[in-house]
Amino acid sequence: RETPTPYPYGFGVDENNPPQPNMSEPIKLVGLMKESGVKLVNASMGSPYYNPHIGRPFERPPIDGYETPEHPLVGVDRHFRLTADIQQAHPDLPIVGTGYSWLQNYVVNAGEANVQDGKVRFVAVGRGSMAYPDYVKDTMESGQMAKNKSCVAISYCTALMRAKDNPLHQFPSGCVPRDRFYAQIYKDAEKTLTQQ
C-alpha cells in the first residue's frame, strides 16, 4: 500500500513510500558503528508502540493494539531479508537476527538455515524464550523444539509489558498461555488495559 505523504525523517524507509524499506542508511550506519569499534549489531525494525507488526509479527494483537495489516510471515520474511542485507554488506561483523518467535517450534530450523546461508551470524529469540526458556536444551537433546512449549504469538506478554498501572510501574512479563504464574497477573493487568 502506498503512503501519499512524503516521510523525509524516516530511517531505513523510502521517504516517498514509508512502508517500503531503503537499507542504504542502516547499512551505512552499521559501517560507521563498525569503524567506531562496535563488534556486534542486533538488527531490529519498526517501533513496538507505533507499528509492532513490523518488529514482532503476531498472531493476535495485544488488548490495546490493532489487527496486523499483513500475514505474520510477511513480517518474518522482512526481518530475514533486511537482516541479510546488513549481514551481506558487512560479512566481517556478526549481525544478530530477530523476528523469529512467530515461527513457534520452527525457530531453530529457520535460524540454522539463515546462519548456514550467511544471512545472519546469530539468532535472538525474545518472546519465544519467555514461553520456552529451555528451547536450546530441548533442541540439543532431541533435535527439535516442542510445539506445546513454543510461543504462540498472541501478545499477552506484550500487554503485560504495556500495562503500567501497578506499584512497580510495569507488570512482570511472561508467557500467560505457557506459564500459569502469569495468568493471574494478566487478569490484573487486563483491568488496567481496558481502562486506558
What is each model feature region?
Residues 1-196:
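Flavin-dependent oxidoreductase catalytic cores
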